Amino acid sequence: MRWSDSENNKIDYIEDFATHFLNKNALLNVICKFCVFRSNSDLWVMRPYQICATERILEKIKEDNRNSKNSKNASKGGCIWHSTGSGKTLTSFKAVQLASEIDFVDKVLFVVDRKDLDNQTIEEYEKFQAGSVSETENTNDLKEKILDDSTATRAIVTTIHKLKRLIDQRSKLKDEDLKKKNIVLIFDECHRSQFGKMKQEIDEFF
């Protein structure tokens, strides 16, 4: 494996590698947060850019939470770019898992744009950790799991279509606390889902 720093500069010398990755904080983070035992007992260690991407997502969540208390116009969100075959699924899994452990986060929704990706994501996440996320059968199931306060449903995989149908039922949600929850939305394949009317209405609702 070729290692690099947070700016994607290659690290070729053992002294530089030791400085960046063998200090106690970095090494402890890799061991405790950025390793995954798959269901077949293989140990996967995240690549440097996957670790940086995941850490930046978590930093952005915390930053936006702080800013939201100071300004109604605080910018929210961001974009992580992964090329095909670069390990997007593992990055997204760790981002969802670690975001759901942040104390002020009530729910993390990993939103895909097709039903087959919904099933595929669940299958892949189950290989990383059984029971790590909840799947949604339909819009009502999604609503119930968002409103459920148990830790078993803190991380949810769903489709953008179910989420859109849910906010279309806002008249039925007026007596419930859906909008009061701190919900992190992570969109898969955002180049296909970030510019349409569905995404705009979801942003406006939350």
UniProtKB/Swiss-Prot annotation:
<dbReference type="GO" id="GO:0009307">
    <property type="term" value="P:DNA restriction-modification system"/>
</dbReference>
<keyword id="KW-0680">Restriction system</keyword>
<dbReference type="InterPro" id="IPR040980">
    <property type="entry name" value="SWI2_SNF2"/>
</dbReference>
<protein>
    <recommendedName>
        <fullName>Putative type I restriction enzyme MpnIIP endonuclease subunit C-terminal part</fullName>
    </recommendedName>
</protein>
<comment type="function">
    <text>The C-terminal section of a putative type I restriction enzyme that if reconstituted might recognize 5'-GAN(7)TAY-3' and cleave a random distance away. Subunit R is required for both nuclease and ATPase activities, but not for modification.</text>
</comment>
<dbReference type="Pfam" id="PF18766">
    <property type="entry name" value="SWI2_SNF2"/>
</dbReference>
<dbReference type="InterPro" id="IPR051268">
    <property type="entry name" value="Type-I_R_enzyme_R_subunit"/>
</dbReference>
<dbReference type="InterPro" id="IPR027417">
    <property type="entry name" value="P-loop_NTPase"/>
</dbReference>
<dbReference type="InterPro" id="IPR014001">
    <property type="entry name" value="Helicase_ATP-bd"/>
</dbReference>
<dbReference type="GO" id="GO:0009035">
    <property type="term" value="F:type I site-specific deoxyribonuclease activity"/>
</dbReference>
